[in-house]
Amino acid sequence: MPQPEQLPGPNADIWNWQLQGLCRGMDSSMFFHPDGERGRARTQREQRAKEMCRRCPVIEACRSHALEVGEPYGVWGGLSESERDLLLKGTMGRTRGIRRTA
């Protein structure tokens, strides 16, 4: 099935950045953990996802989206679930100098 080049209607402003994501069309299992995944396997999968995010032209838009909507699962904008949770609670931003973009 062909991928759309632009999203329709009011969603375009919110979601169009996803069309430029390096992850577009990739297997989502790289970014979202299977049930029960823990430890080394989870860490390694997250690191592979974050490597892709670091090269992505829309990393900032992706990260902002995930923080704004409180995305509960997966690696978004180079941040894992737990990293986003810490950022949203203010802990990580203060201790590591990471700022939240809006």
UniProtKB/Swiss-Prot annotation:
This is Redox- and pH-responsive transcriptional regulator WhiB3. Keywords: 4Fe-4S, Cytoplasm, Disulfide bond, DNA-binding, Iron, Iron-sulfur, Metal-binding, Stress response, Transcription, Transcription regulation, Virulence. Signal peptide: none annotated. Its main location: cytoplasm. Belongs to the WhiB family. A redox-sensitive transcriptional regulator. Maintains intracellular redox homeostasis by regulating catabolic metabolism and polyketide biosynthesis. Regulates expression of the redox buffer ergothioneine (ERG) in a carbon-source-dependent manner; loss of ERG or mycothiol (MSH, the other major redox buffer in this bacteria) leads to respiratory alterations and bioenergetic deficiencies that negatively impact virulence. The keyword Thylakoid does not apply. Binds 1 [4Fe-4S] cluster per subunit. Following nitrosylation of the [4Fe-4S] cluster binds 1 [4Fe-8(NO)] cluster per subunit. Changing C23A: No 4Fe-4S cluster assembly, does not complement growth defects. Changing C53A: No 4Fe-4S cluster assembly, does not complement growth defects. InterPro entries: 4FE4S_WBL (IPR034768), Whib (IPR003482). Disruption phenotype: Not essential for growth in culture, or growth in vivo in mouse and guinea pig infections. Disruption significantly enhances survival of immunocompetent mice. Decreased bacterial growth in guinea pig lungs, but not spleen. Growth on minimal media, glucose or succinate is poor, suggesting WhiB3 is involved in starvation response. Growth on acetate is better than wild-type. 55-fold decreased survival at pH 4.5, no difference at pH 5.5 or 6.6. PANTHER family: TRANSCRIPTIONAL REGULATOR WHID, TRANSCRIPTIONAL REGULATOR WHID-RELATED. Homodimer. Interacts with the C-terminal 54 residues of sigma factor SigA (RpoV). It comes from Mycobacterium tuberculosis (strain ATCC 25618 / H37Rv).
